[in-house]
Curated annotation (Swiss-Prot):
GO molecular function, one term: RNA polymerase II general transcription initiation factor activity
Function: Component of the general transcription and DNA repair factor IIH (TFIIH) core complex, which is involved in general and transcription-coupled nucleotide excision repair (NER) of damaged DNA and, when complexed to TFIIK, in RNA transcription by RNA polymerase II. In NER, TFIIH acts by opening DNA around the lesion to allow the excision of the damaged oligonucleotide and its replacement by a new DNA fragment. In transcription, TFIIH has an essential role in transcription initiation.
Localization (cell): Nucleus
Gene3D superfamilies: TFB5-like
Main location: nucleus
Family indicated by similarity: Belongs to the TFB5 family.
Cellular component terms (Gene Ontology): cytosol; nucleus; transcription factor TFIIH core complex; transcription factor TFIIH holo complex
Taxonomy of the source species: Eukaryota, Fungi, Dikarya, Ascomycota, Taphrinomycotina
Cross-referenced InterPro entries: TFB5-like_sf, TFIIH_TTDA/Tfb5
The name this protein goes by in its record: General transcription and DNA repair factor IIH subunit tfb5
Gene name, Swiss-Prot/TrEMBL: tfb5
Highest taxon listed in the record's lineage: Eukaryota
Listed transmembrane segments: none
Length: 68
């Protein structure tokens, strides 16, 4: 069980987004401090903006766009 520590955020997300974050952590270690369960992670607060930007990029990349 993790202890309280300054600079950590509890992130709750669906399993798909969680897997994307875990993949980011494999490529750039130090993002995820600990996996809590299927929908929760402890994330390094100083890397949160990087995670948000990368998630947005990856989700946009994988979203179907209708051409008009």
């Amino acid at each position: 069980m993790p202890r309280a520590q300054k600079g950590l955020l509890l992130v709750e997300c669906d399993p798909t987004v969680k897997q994307l974050i875990l993949n980011m952590d494999e490529q750039s270690p130090g993002i995820v401090i600990e996996e809590i369960d299927e929908e929760r992670l402890l994330v390094n607060e100083s890397r949160l903006e990087q995670v948000k930007a990368e998630l947005e990029r990856r989700l946009e990349e994988n979203t179907y766009q209708v051409e008009e």
